[in-house]
């Protein structure tokens, strides 16, 4: 026991001096100035030293107990952490005892080799021997040990409470992280904690110790300021927690209100969307119903209108299709149209192949006749199809009783059969007349067996005329048109008058003077110049309207057209025309050949007949009254045929320049 007490006394002397020095300082930072005076004033009596130590220990204990009580009062608000705090106190006491024993062991080992800060200051400032200082330290043994034990216990308690406080604060901050105000307060609390921690670290760094040694005296020096700092930190934490709780309550309430408001808005939006969808669906259904009603009404209206139009078209088409004939019977109008088309064909057939002396210049070409006939056939077929559709629509659209409807169907079927048979006969007749040609004044008509034959055309069936369509016949009579003239000729067929009646010239009949010999000599000069000017006009018109001249013809005319020496069209005197012919002979060679090829069409046998010359004659007689005598002079052998050589000689073309290769 004595050895144990002695050992404790030695430990007390080691711990007494720095503990007293720490308690005397206001900022928990011992310096040489604060420690040195206490250590330099060596007491004369042991009793005084012991009393002073007791007083300081009692004050330290009172301070630490007061802080512990304050922290426990602040922590009593949290009921959930009381039990853990009590357990922490008991465990901290046990840990404090263990720490005391460990510190005793360490102090016994390092006592001789680890002088404290107080002894270092004494060595530097005082000249007293080491034994006196050690005796002074031993005087402060008991109070040092007690104060050390109490400080360890209080430190462990405060650490437990701090460790419990920190997770509570952390969880509290996590729950209120969305609030900006609570975040600012949390940052402020952290800033308040950081200086305390940094101050503690600075204190630990400022307390010197020798390198390579584990000095427990330095740890004990820092324990009391740590208690003070930890207690202060706990007060700040509790205050900040109270502030955070108070500040978080309105933010939580506002957040709940916002959630409720958002939820209410969302419900309103959902309700409004549902209402809009219902309204849209109802509107769509109404629109569909209205469109259905309108479509039904439109269908009925359209059916009525179409039926009305079809009946009107039927009556009009039937009226147009039927017309009176010479026999008093009614014949289809479209057949009469074909007759009109064949009218010209008949005239052409009369005057063309049979070469009767008539006006062949105005006979339509075969292509024109065929196109006209095809058009009439297509029109006829279209009318028949429309009539069939009208009958079908009438059958479908009727809403009459069943018996009457069946009777009407029977009538319609019989009518359709009759019309179809008539239509077939008409189509067959039209097809047979397509390849059958009649001379002018005649029309093609098929008999009951479908065989085509030519009949005379009624002048009434000729198309409407204009004043410019008038022609003059050889009987010196003016006719409304060539159709009327040749229809009259057909009726007079078999008589002398009918045989002699021909188309003399275009226009109304007038007095034609007799051609003299001098005029016959001058006629070829005017005729050559006229043919040349006609080609120039066709060349100019062909650039805008293709089809007048082919490529070879254009190349030939181009040379004449671009020649600067060409005599322009005009009323020139005979002397000028003769001089130009001699000077620019080559410009007149091709126009003479071109006119022969234009007249040699029915047939193209390199020979011109009177019928082929008739178109040119009829157009020139009113201006050139010598044209008839000129054509008579061109046929010296009087065979009624004019060859290319005879034609060339009449126009003064040399025999070596007459070439059939120019007939293209």
UniProtKB/Swiss-Prot annotation:
Gene3D superfamilies: 3.30.60.30, EF-hand
SUPFAM superfamilies given in the database record: EF-hand, EGF/Laminin, Kazal-type serine protease inhibitors
Comp. bias (Basic residues): 170-180
Expression sites (tissue/organ): Highly expressed in lymph node, brain, heart, lung, skeletal muscle, ovary, small intestine, and colon, with lower levels in placenta, pancreas, testis, spleen, and thymus, and no expression in kidney, liver, and peripheral blood leukocytes.
Region span, O-glycosylated at one additional site: 25-34
Entry annotated with the keyword Iron-sulfur: no
Cysteines joined through disulfide linkages: 433-444, 438-454, 456-490, 462-483, 472-509, 515-626, 634-650
Family stated for the protein in its record: Belongs to the SPARC family.
Name of the molecule in the record: SPARC-like protein 1
Organism: Homo sapiens (Human)
Lineage: Eukaryota, Metazoa, Chordata, Craniata, Vertebrata
């Amino acid at each position: 026991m004595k050895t144990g007490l002695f050992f404790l006394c030695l430990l007390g002397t080691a711990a007494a001096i720095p503990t007293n020095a720490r308690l005397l300082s206001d900022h928990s930072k011992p310096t040489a100035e604060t420690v040195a005076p206490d250590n330099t004033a060596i007491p004369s009596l042991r009793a005084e030293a012991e009393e002073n130590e007791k007083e300081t220990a009692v004050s330290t204990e009172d301070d630490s107990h007061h802080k512990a009580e304050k922290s426990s009062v602040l922590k009593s608000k949290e009921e959930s952490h009381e039990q853990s705090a009590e357990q922490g106190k008991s465990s901290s006491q046990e840990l404090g005892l263990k720490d005391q024993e460990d510190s005793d062991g360490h102090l016994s080992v390092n006592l001789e080799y680890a002088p404290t800060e107080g002894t270092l200051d004494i060595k530097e400032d005082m000249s007293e021997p080491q034994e006196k200082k050690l005796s002074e330290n031993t005087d402060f043994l008991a109070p040092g040990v007690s104060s050390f034990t109490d400080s360890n216990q209080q430190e462990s308690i405060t650490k437990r409470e701090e460790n419990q406080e920190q997770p509570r604060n952390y969880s509290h901050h996590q729950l209120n992280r969305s609030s900006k105000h609570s975040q600012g307060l949390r940052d402020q609390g952290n800033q308040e904690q950081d200086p305390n921690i940094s101050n503690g670290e600075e204190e630990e760094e400022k307390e010197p110790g020798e390198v390579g040694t584990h000095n427990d005296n330095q740890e004990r020096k820092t324990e009391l300021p740590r208690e003070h700092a930890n207690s202060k930190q706990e007060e700040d934490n509790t205050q900040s927690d109270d502030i955070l709780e108070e500040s978080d309550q309105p933010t939580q309430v506002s957040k709940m209100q916002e959630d409720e408001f958002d939820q209410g808005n969302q419900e309103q939006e959902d309700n409004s969307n549902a209402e809009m969808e219902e309204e849209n669906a109802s509107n769509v259904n109404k629109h569909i119903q209205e469109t259905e009603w309108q479509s039904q009404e439109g269908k009925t209206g359209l059916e009525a209108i179409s039926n009305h139009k079809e009946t009107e078209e039927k009556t009009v088409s039937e009226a147009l299709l039927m017309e009176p004939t010479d026999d008093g019977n009614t014949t289809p109008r479209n057949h009469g149209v074909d007759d009109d088309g064949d009218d010209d064909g008949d005239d052409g057939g009369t005057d063309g192949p049979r070469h009767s002396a008539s006006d062949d210049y105005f006979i339509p070409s075969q292509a024109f006749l065929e196109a006209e006939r095809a058009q009439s056939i297509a029109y006829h077929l279209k009318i028949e199809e429309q009539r069939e559709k009208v009958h079908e629509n009438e059958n479908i659209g009727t809403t009459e009783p069943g018996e009457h409807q069946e009777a009407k169907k029977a009538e319609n079927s019989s009518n359709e059969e009759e019309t179809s048979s008539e239509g077939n006969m008409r189509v067959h007749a039209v097809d047979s007349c397509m390849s059958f040609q009649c001379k002018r004044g005649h029309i093609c008509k098929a008999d009951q067996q479908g065989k085509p034959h030519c009949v005379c055309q009624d002048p009434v069936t000729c198309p409407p005329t204009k004043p410019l369509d008038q022609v003059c016949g050889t009987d010196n009579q003016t006719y409304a048109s060539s159709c009327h003239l040749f229809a009259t000729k057909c009726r007079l067929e078999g008589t002398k008058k009918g045989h002699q009646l021909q188309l003399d010239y275009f226009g109304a009949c007038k007095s034609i003077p007799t051609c003299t010999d001098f005029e016959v000599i001058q006629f070829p000069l005017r005729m050559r110049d006229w043919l040349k000017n006609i080609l120039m006009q066709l060349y100019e018109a062909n650039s805008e309207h293709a089809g007048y001249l082919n490529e070879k013809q254009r190349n030939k005319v181009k040379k004449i057209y671009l020649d600067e020496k060409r005599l322009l069209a005009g009323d020139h005197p005979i002397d000028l025309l003769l001089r130009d012919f001699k000077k620019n002979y080559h410009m007149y060679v091709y126009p003479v050949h071109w006119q022969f090829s234009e007249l040699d069409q029915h047939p193209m046998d390199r020979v011109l007949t009177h019928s082929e010359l008739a178109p040119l004659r009829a157009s020139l007689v009113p201006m050139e009254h010598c044209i008839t005598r000129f054509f008579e002079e061109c046929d010296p052998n009087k065979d009624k045929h004019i060859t290319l050589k005879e034609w060339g000689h009449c126009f003064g073309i040399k025999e070596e320049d007459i070439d059939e290769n120019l007939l293209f």
